Amino acid sequence: MIPMHVAVIMDGNGRWARKQLQERTFGHEQGVSVLESIVDECINCGIRFLTVYAFSTENWSRPPTEVSFLFELLSAAIQRVRTTYRERNVKVQFCGERTTQIPETVIAAMNCIEQDTAACTGLILSVCFNYGGHTEIAQACRSVLADCLEGDAVENIKTRLQMPIEQFIQQIDTHLYANLPPVDLLIRTGCEKRLSNFLPWHLAYAEIIFSDLLWPEFSVRAFKDCLDEFASRTRRFGGVQLSPMTGVYSDTHPHSSTNALSNHD
């Protein structure tokens, strides 16, 4: 079984560079090459969504020279893959806050590749840049409240307070940064075992694999191994299924990653 939505925390660039007796920026350069190879593999094996953690809202605390280099690296990568991804039917979108801290040239490059690939219908590559999961949810809730101010605010608020919780959850979901389905598989490289404020809304039932490889070491073979591990797991989504043949509850579940995709095409 191939996951529909794979998310990746690409951790370990700086540590890998230090192991090579190089500057941290060298690790980031190698990390971009690895990402491009993983994108190619996602296309080859039919994965529908790939979401990657490129720059968090907490990364602003890094040295200014490193942050500036990351901006330059992003712009260069966009220019390099822009035509290729359009030709390969890859839709690219950025998730995060586009604040004035980000150089205008970088914002322009992001907008450009989004526009160029907007009509693509293959792999959807979501790049989380200046992203924080708590901020994403808070901004979505703000947008729901803002919607209430259109017309009779008091009545609109009452309506939302009285609606079924599933419907209210759907309203929040539609105001998130991008129209993404739940994550099926999360991969984090770099030895750490935490989520780092990445996609908390989407990770509720994700299978998680923590890799001891640093991101520049993460090969296509390592990615395939993660897919094999995912395929070997039983996803129960918190429940069990009653077998009509035996009358016994089993650990299998009728839901699969394709069900999560239905409202997000």
Swiss-Prot record:
Q: Would I find Magnesium among this entry's keywords?
A: yes
**Cofactor(s) listed in the protein's UniProt record:** Mg(2+)
Q: Which organism is it from?
A: Giardia intestinalis (strain ATCC 50803 / WB clone C6)
- Top-level EC class, please? transferase
- State which pathway it belongs to: Protein modification; protein glycosylation; Lipid metabolism
- Gene (UniProt): UPPS
Any one GO molecular-function label of the UniProt entry: ditrans,polycis-undecaprenyl-diphosphate synthase [(2E,6E)-farnesyl-diphosphate specific] activity
> What keywords is this UniProt entry annotated with?
Lipid metabolism, Magnesium, Transferase
- Record-linked InterPro entries: UPP_synth-like, UPP_synth-like_sf
Q: Which domain of life is it from?
A: Eukaryota
Reaction equations catalysed: 8 isopentenyl diphosphate + (2E,6E)-farnesyl diphosphate = di-trans,octa-cis-undecaprenyl diphosphate + 8 diphosphate
The identity of this protein, by name, is Di-trans,poly-cis-undecaprenyl-diphosphate synthase
